[in-house]
Amino acid sequence: MKALFSIAWRSAWNRRFTLALTVFSIALSTFLLLGVERIRTELRENFASSVSGTDLIVGARTGSTQLLLYSVFRIGAATNNISWKSVQALQAHPGVDWVVPLSLGDSHRGFAVLATSTDYFTRFRYGDKQLLKLREGKPFNELFDAVVGAEVADKLGYHVGQKITLAHGSGELNVAEHADKPFTVVGVLARTGTPVDRTVHIGLAAMEAIHLEWVGGAPMPGVHIPAEQVRKFDLTPKNVTAALVGLKNRAAVFGVQRWISTYTGEPLMAILPGVALDELWSVIGIGENALLLMSALVALVSLAGLVSVVMAGLNERRRELAVLRAVGAGLRHVLALLALEGAMVTVLGVLLGVVMALLGIALLSPWLQAQFGLTLSLSEPTLNEWLLMASLLVAGWLASLLPGIRAYRLSLADGLSPRI
């Protein structure tokens, strides 16, 4: 075996420039496969961890996916709001432990503004039921206090004490700015890898205060209420967009859900976050399969390149293989020699691809986190990643057997006879 390995190594070294291209091709396919698999895994984990520890999300009757999108991911808009009376009825339900109202509709320089209660900072959880943490500052307490997510602070360069103004309307479609009622940033949340990072948080009373002179989504002509006078008005919310609900006993979730769906005050619906997240992922997860398929095709092309390189080199190696057969090498030895060469090339390619993937994660992770909120960790390979690497190694070894069979079929005389 040692002699066979020595022959295989010397033969490969003799054709090192050609094989180097094959090694790089396999490394590239390994890099793509592992990269896509890691992004797919982390993306799904980040997606599934957007909200946890919440038993129900309640909103106006609509589709479960739509309710999840605007209440958790700040995407889209609610068809209707729910009245404050309904929120109070939820809070009074004997099976409900806590309720965190959510009010959306405004924005700040493209980032969503979420009005909520201070319970949001102690009740909302993400990931493995992790609580929100402040990177600096404190939760909002005064009327015009604001707490911004990590991505908002990093992209806009905000720190505690920064003055900001909010705009009516979501995203870039701002109707008008509430320039007469500026907010002060009092806290910056630690990064979570969830939509919280891209959100400006204010109190429910503050949302009412900046819309006192607004009716039907537009400011009343000639009416202006200065910021210092808004406290004279009743700032209790009239309605909210949705509410996060925690139960005293999770076993009662379907009973409370049924009570909400039959609530007579107004048409409401309640969704289980985990179920709704799975439904949404089944729709948007098609893209990950397409990426994985493309990477697999790249790997297939690389392996085809390995076969073609070895096949093309057979003509150059006719004499080498013929000499081996002349000294007693059988089919088993020829196959073993070429299979060993193929395995060496594949192993080198896979190892180089793993190194490239690790370097890629280390270098691109900060950029992906800053641009897309996607956190990639330099953790040990997952089971799927081990299986992908093993599949590449086996496929490379099998691909090298095809030229071996072809090589043995060449006649001994053909290999030993000189060609002019």
Locate predicted features:
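N-terminal Sec/SRP start-transfer signal
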Residues: 1-34, 339, 420
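Internal alpha-helical transmembrane segments of multipass membrane proteins
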Residues: 24, 289-309
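Mechanotransmission and gating elements of multispan inner-membrane complexes involved in transport
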Residues: 177-184, 188-288
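Short helix-loop junctions at transmembrane helix boundaries
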Residues: 351-391, 401-414
